Amino acid sequence: MKTKADFFRMKQADEPIVMVTAYDFPSAKLVEQAGVDMILVGDSLGMVVLGYDSTIPVTVDDMIHHTKAVRRGAPNTFIVTDMPFMSYHASKEEALQNARRIMQQSGANAVKVEGADEVVETIAALTKAGVPVVAHLGLTPQSVGVLGGYKVQGKDAESAKKLLNDAKQCEQAGAIALVLECVPKQLGAAVARELTIPVIGIGAGAEVDGQVLVYHDLLGYGVNRVPKFVKQYAAIQETIVEALANYIADVKLRQFPEPAHTFTMKEEEWVALYGGKQS
């Protein structure tokens, strides 16, 4: 399993870090088999696998449940788990309690928190307690209501300057990495240059230290609209629908199961059961 030190080394060597967001055992197993460096168990599971219209309803229990499944599928991969909405905002004590639960019960290697300002103090408190923290800036899904929806952040000089300053504060507070979402590529490159910790982009251009995409998005598997920053490397959903349609047709036509998929009883046992040949 790669460690925090490995990710710092990769940044220094200009070796891109590959991260995938996964939510369950089978996807995590395939992600690890493919050789991904890091897995994110994101609270986006609320929309991708639980059918919510945002990340807001996701709970700490949800995150623990899904991270445990991911850990079973990827025992040798560094896992980062999102702290969901309002699990680290009310007080540092609550943040510590929820982070402790996630780290102790789920098998995560680090937690991720969104935002800056007061969240920087939370990052510092968690770090002091020995919890590795990944920060998340730019488009922060837990704050889409405040941000005015799913929009590119840091497009003007003033907001870009604030974001860069926020990133530095997160690093100073002890964050081990930064996820930077949906910002202009120039800003993504600048943040990566200015920080010593790895900057992992999602819609932040190619000049950051790594990339993260959601498993379902990059495989073309899911019902949600795919953002502009996603490149789909497969069209699994079409394959699945076609396979299901073929299964339905075979059952309706009694072409499934075939002999290869059925079990038989010895003729003498069948005779003993019915007292005569019935087959």
Curated annotation (Swiss-Prot):
Its main location: cytoplasm. Keywords: Cytoplasm, Magnesium, Metal-binding, Pantothenate biosynthesis, Transferase. The active site is at E181. Transmembrane segments: none annotated. Catalyzes the reversible reaction in which hydroxymethyl group from 5,10-methylenetetrahydrofolate is transferred onto alpha-ketoisovalerate to form ketopantoate. 3-methyl-2-oxobutanoate binds at D43, S44, D82, K112. Its cofactor is Mg(2+). It comes from Geobacillus thermodenitrificans (strain NG80-2). It is found in: Cytoplasm. This is 3-methyl-2-oxobutanoate hydroxymethyltransferase. One of its GO terms (cellular component) is cytoplasm. It is an enzyme of class 2 (transferase).
